[in-house]
Amino acid sequence: FFSIYNVPAFVQGLGSLAAARRAMERLDAKAMRAGLEGVHWNLLAFGTPVLPGEQVATDQAELQRRLGANSSTSYVWVTHTTLPDRETDYNLVRDQYMAHWDTVRTQYDAPYFPNITVGWDASPRTNQSEPWVGGGGADYPYMNIVVNNTPENFKKVLEMTKERLLADPNGPRALTINCWNEWTEGSCLEPDTLYGMAYLDALKEVFGR
């Protein structure tokens, strides 16, 4: 399993789509010579860039086809959603992402692994000596944040995602979670002083049985 985060930058770095595809095929062949089944190529899809320098493909589905992707996923909800309020409710962002999932699952040829995002607050990465006001059009890390991302709401989206995955007998049985320890982006599963083990407990309660 090999996941490529910034696919346009990967292609650009190798010189062309054709060159990138050849490099992927060479690694795939090398894995098979080593006795493996080959490389499962997972490509991250972006709707809008978040970090400075990130690039977005104009046609994600075509890019995946031309590179021979085995699957795709997303890194975080906010690359596919909007944060209209300075403090945007978690459940609103969840519903936007679920609508995005409904769209791409019919557009992409390869299976799409849905993402579950714990939260989003990049304000710790701002200049702490200056006022932070956020704003719908503000650049990272001065963008709006997500609130109400409680363990209970996180558990709810885990249940929703599990139900959707199991409802499709031919669909994937995989998902991604953002994130284990992005403390300065407000998205972390690790135990903390506010909720303790609650996020991990929610994950265990939904998928541990």
Enumerate the language-model features and the residues they cover.
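Glycan-processing catalytic domains of CAZymes
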Residues: F1-R209
